[in-house]
């Protein structure tokens, strides 16, 4: 398959993957159905717990049954979960819908990246991965920005309309996946040997024993934890006394997040060429942490800091995926990427739990500053471990 064909199919997949219509309103639906903040907190924890627990099994299934089938299942299961939210009325029914939503996401997590990398590699153009994935992320983020703004308005007309529309869009996403070619992912190997769980465990161990890879994954997982706890408190911070935005402006703010992140994603390959991956991870995440550290002293910097955070994270995520892909054997690629995603989920749970306690004890802005300092210390150690090893491009790894 030629680069242009892979690229446009991936862009269409990214476009129909967006769930922007429900991003700014799904918590409002929970409140409208009479759920308490305790119930909402429980559902959020349940969602992340399912993400973490399902990552390895669904990643393994993705490698076992093929990436196209895994992505097809992801679209259908996610559509069912999102549609279920429209019908849910009780805590149990919301829990079941969110569980389906999370499981669907884990079927996609890592698998879409693994498919893209393999499809490009089969055509001898694996070096285009950063460019294509970055542009694909930009397409998705731009679509999310537009639909987020629409979703806020649509919600005022119909409580459930955004959920039904996203479920329909995900059905289109499933149809797009069916147009993907099947990419060889190592299934020509003996199934009696290659797909044993013991073999998978051995190959996962081998992947994470490569020089610097554990430290690098730890660095990016720690970064994700900081990003996730910040995202959790965006709405109470910007609507509260410290910033004072009207509630109606929050949808526009979320659209701004996605527009800026889309622009940054589109420039990922240029950042790689001009700045380099090593310098990016030395400067970008530390700039993010520094912007959070100053918030208790300069609350006016809150909105720019949150916008900048989204841009920095999306570029970092693409580079993370590229580095892990480069150093992972083809037939276990989705499984390894799912392990990385699982690590991010664990960090998200930990940061959110600690962040909630600290926010009640001090204040949300001071909590973010304290956790940003924790990140600076931890990332400094991990970056020292990875520097000079994992950031070296190894073409032999790419071809495996």
Language-model features: locations:
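C-terminal ends and interior cores of transmembrane alpha-helices
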Residues: 76-90, 95, 286-299
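A single, central transmembrane helix in multi-pass transporters
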Residues: 22-23, 39, 159-164, 206-264
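Pair of pore-lining "gating" transmembrane helices in MFS-fold secondary transporters
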Residues: 1-35, 99, 209-230, 307-311
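Transmembrane alpha-helix termini and helix-breaking/packing motifs in multi-pass membrane transporters
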Residues: 32, 91, 144-166, 236-245, ...
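Cytoplasmic helix-loop-helix junction between adjacent transmembrane helices
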Residues: 98-142
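Juxtamembrane intracellular "pre-TM" segments in multi-pass secondary transporters
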Residues: 1-3, 178-219, 240, 400
């Amino acid at each position: 398959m030629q680069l242009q064909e892979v690229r446009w199919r991936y862009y269409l997949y990214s476009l129909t993957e967006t769930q922007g219509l429900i991003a700014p309103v799904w918590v409002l639906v929970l409140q409208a159905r009479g759920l308490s903040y305790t119930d909402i907190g429980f559902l959020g924890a349940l969602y992340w717990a399912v993400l973490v627990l399902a990552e390895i099994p669904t990643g393994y299934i993705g490698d076992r049954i093929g990436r196209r089938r895994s992505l097809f299942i992801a679209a259908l299961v996610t559509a069912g979960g999102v549609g279920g939210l429209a019908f849910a009325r009780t805590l149990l029914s919301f829990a079941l819908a969110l569980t389906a939503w999370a499981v669907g996401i884990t079927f996609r997590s890592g698998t879409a990246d693994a498919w893209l990398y393999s499809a490009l590699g089969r055509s001898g153009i694996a070096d285009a991965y950063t460019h294509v994935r970055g542009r694909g992320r930009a397409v998705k983020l731009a679509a999310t920005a537009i639909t987020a703004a629409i979703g806020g308005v649509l919600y005022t007309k119909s409580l459930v309309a955004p959920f039904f529309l996203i479920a329909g869009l995900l059905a289109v996403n499933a149809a797009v996946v069916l147009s993907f070619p099947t990419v060889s992912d190592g299934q020509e190997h003996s199934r009696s040997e290659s797909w044993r769980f013991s073999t998978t465990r051995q190959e996962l161990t081998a992947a994470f024993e490569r020089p610097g890879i554990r430290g690098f994954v730890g660095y990016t997982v720690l970064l994700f934890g900081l990003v996730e706890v910040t995202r959790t408190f965006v709405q109470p911070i910007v609507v509260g006394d410290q910033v004072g935005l009207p509630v109606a402006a929050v949808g526009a703010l979320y659209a701004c997040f996605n527009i800026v992140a889309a622009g940054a994603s589109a420039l990922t390959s240029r950042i790689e060429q001009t700045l380099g991956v090593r310098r990016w991870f030395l400067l970008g995440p530390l700039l993010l942490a520094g912007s959070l550290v100053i918030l208790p002293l300069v609350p006016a910097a809150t909105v720019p800091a949150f916008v900048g955070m989204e841009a920095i994270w999306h570029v970092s995520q693409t580079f993370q995926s590229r580095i892990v892909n480069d150093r992972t054997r083809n037939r276990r690629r989705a499984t390894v990427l799912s392990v990385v995603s699982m690590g991010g989920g664990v960090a998200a749970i930990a940061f959110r739990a600690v962040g909630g306690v600290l926010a009640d004890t001090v204040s949300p802005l001071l909590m973010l500053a304290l956790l940003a300092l924790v990140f600076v210390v931890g990332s400094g150690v991990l970056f020292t471990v990875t520097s000079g090893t994992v950031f070296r491009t190894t073409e032999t790894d790419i071809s495996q």
